[in-house]
C-alpha cells in the first residue's frame, strides 16, 4: 500500500507539497526523516521522536540483518513492533554501507559480498535478498540495492556502477512484485551516475521506465563540493516524474535542505543532526554553535530562543554545557532532541510556507537569520 499525490506547487521555485499514504499512516511532504539505523535513533525513544514531529523514520537493512537479525525481528512481525514505532518506516537497502566498508566488500553481478564488521563472517546481499529482508522488516518504503561510488571517480567506473544499479533495480522490482510488495509498501529506485550529467540522465531514464513508486537521488555527500552536489541534485531532480516522490539521500546541512526543497525534493535523511548533537554542535535559527565553548558556561538563556523543543523550553546553555563537560549521558539526549526538532521543523516550516504561497519569503528570511550575529545581536560565541 503506497500512494503519493502533490497538493501545492510554488509559483516562484520548483518547491511543492504532497502526501504519501502508507500502511502505517500518511506523511506530508517535504519531510525530514530521522536516521534510526539499528531500529533506534540514538538516545531517543519513539515518544521523543513523536514529540519532535517525526512522521517517518529510516532504518537500515544491512545493519538490522546483521544485528539483531531477521529471526529475532520475525518474532515481532517486523521492526515497528520490535522498536515500538507505529508510524511509517523507510529502510535503506545497505548499498551505502557496503560502499563505506569497501575494504570488506566485493561487488559482482550477483550482488554485494562482504564481511561483517561485527565478527568477520561472510555474507552476500543480492537484489532479491534485500527485498526479502525488507519484507521481513515490515518496511513501508523499501529501497533497491544500489552501487555507490566515491568522489572523485572516473567516468567509466561511474557508468559501470550506474548500469549495475539499474540491472539490480530491475531484479529488485521483480522480487517486490513476486512477493506481493505493491499491496503492502512502496519501492524506490536509486539514481546513480556520479557527478556526470549524462550518466545521471541515462540512469534516471531507465529507472523511470521500470516504473517505481518513487525515486531517490543517491551517490551524493561522498566528498564532492557543495556546489557540485546541488548542481547534480538539480539536474537529477529535473529528470524525475512529477507524480512520484523524490528522495535526496544522506544530505545535508540546513541550508542545503532549504535549497533542495526549492529544487523540488520531497524527502530527506541525514545523520548530521544526531551525530553533531553528540559532539556538542547544535543547529539554531541563527546558525550553529558549539555548546562546549567556554563562552556558554554562564549563559542563562536557551540554545535557541526561537525554539520550542523540550531542551530549549527547560534548560539553559550553561546547564547543557555542564552536562557535556561532565560527560553526562543526558547531554546527548537533550542535544539530539534539540537538533532533530530543529531539522524536522525547518522542513515543516518550509512545507507550510509552500502551501501558503510564501516560500520565497521563507527562504529569504532563513538566510537572513542564518547570517545574523546571534539572537541577542552579538556573536553568540567566538569559534562557535
Curated annotation (Swiss-Prot):
The similarity annotation says:
Belongs to the queuine tRNA-ribosyltransferase family.
Entry annotation: catalytic residues: 92 (proton acceptor), 269 (nucleophile)
Q: What is this protein called?
A: Queuine tRNA-ribosyltransferase
Which GO terms fall under biological process for this protein?
Answer: queuosine biosynthetic process; tRNA wobble guanine modification; tRNA-guanine transglycosylation
Q: What is its EC number?
A: 2.4.2.29
Q: Which residue intervals make up region (RNA binding)?
A: 250-256, 274-278
How cofactor binds (record note)? Binds 1 zinc ion per subunit.
**Keyword set, alphabetical order:** Glycosyltransferase, Metal-binding, Queuosine biosynthesis, Transferase, tRNA processing, Zinc
Which amino acids does the record list as binding Zn(2+)? 307, 309, 312, 338
Its gene is tgt
Q: How does it assemble?
A: Homodimer. Within each dimer, one monomer is responsible for RNA recognition and catalysis, while the other monomer binds to the replacement base PreQ1.
Pfam entry (one): TGT
Q: Does the keyword Zinc apply?
A: yes
Organism, per UniProt? Desulfosudis oleivorans (strain DSM 6200 / JCM 39069 / Hxd3)
Amino acid at each position: 500500500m503506497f500512494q503519493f499525490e502533490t497538493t501545492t506547487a510554488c509559483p516562484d521555485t520548483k518547491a511543492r507539497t504532497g502526501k504519501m499514504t502508507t500502511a502505517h499512516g500518511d506523511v506530508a511532504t517535504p519531510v525530514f526523516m530521522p536516521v534510526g539505523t539499528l531500529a533506534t535513533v540514538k538516545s531517543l525513544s519513539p515518544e521523543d521522536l513523536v514529540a519532535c514531529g517525526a512522521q517517518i523514520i529510516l532504518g537500515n537493512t544491512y545493519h538490522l540483518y546483521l544485528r539483531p537479525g531477521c529471526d529475532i525481528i520475525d518474532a515481532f512481525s517486523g521492526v515497528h513492533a520490535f522498536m515500538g514505532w507505529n508510524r511509517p518506516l523507510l529502510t535503506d537497502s545497505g548499498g551505502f554501507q557496503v560502499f563505506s566498508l569497501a575494504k570488506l566488500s566485493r561487488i559482482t553481478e550477483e550482488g554485494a559480498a562482504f564481511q561483517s564488521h561485527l565478527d568477520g563472517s561472510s555474507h552476500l546481499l543480492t537484489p532479491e535478498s534485500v527485498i526479502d529482508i525488507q519484507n521481513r522488516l515490515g518496511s513501508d518504503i523499501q529501497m533497491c540495492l544500489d552501487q555507490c561510488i566515491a568522489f572523485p571517480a572516473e567516468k567509466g567506473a561511474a557508468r559501470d556502477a550506474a548500469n549495475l544499479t539499474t540491472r539490480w533495480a530491475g531484479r529488485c522490482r521483480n522480487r517486490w512484485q513476486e512477493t506481493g510488495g505493491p499491496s503492502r509498501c512502496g519501492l524506490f529506485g536509486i539514481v546513480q551516475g556520479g557527478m556526470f550529467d549524462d550518466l545521471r540522465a541515462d540512469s534516471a531514464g531507465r529507472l523511470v521506465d521500470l516504473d517505481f513508486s518513487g525515486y531517490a537521488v543517491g551517490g551524493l555527500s561522498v566528498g564532492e563540493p557543495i556546489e557540485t552536489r546541488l548542481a547534480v541534485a538539480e539536474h537529477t531532480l529535473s529528470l524525475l516524474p512529477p507524480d512520484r516522490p523524490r528522495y535526496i539521500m544522506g544530505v545535508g546541512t540546513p541550508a542545503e535542505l532549504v535549497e533542495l526543497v526549492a529544487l523540488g525534493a520531497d524527502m530527506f535523511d541525514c545523520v548530521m543532526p544526531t551525530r553533531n548533537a553528540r559532539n556538542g554542535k547544535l543547529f539554531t535559527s541563527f546558525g550553529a554553535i558549539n555548546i562546549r565553548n567556554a563562552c556558554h558556561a554562564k549563559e542563562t538563556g536557551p540554545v535557541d530562543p526561537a525554539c520550542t523543543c523540550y531542551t530549549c523550553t527547560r534548560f539553559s546553555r550553561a546547564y547543557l554545557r555542564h552536562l557535556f563537560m561532565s560527560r553526562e549521558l543526558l547531554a546527548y539526549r537533550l542535544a539530539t532532541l534539540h537538533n532533530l526538532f530543529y531539522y524536522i521543523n525547518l522542513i515543516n516550516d518550509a512545507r507550510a510556507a509552500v502551501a501558503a504561497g510564501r516560500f520565497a519569503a521563507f527562504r529569504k528570511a532563513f538566510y537572513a537569520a542564518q547570517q545574523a550575529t546571534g539572537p541577542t545581536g552579538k556573536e553568540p560565541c567566538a569559534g562557535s
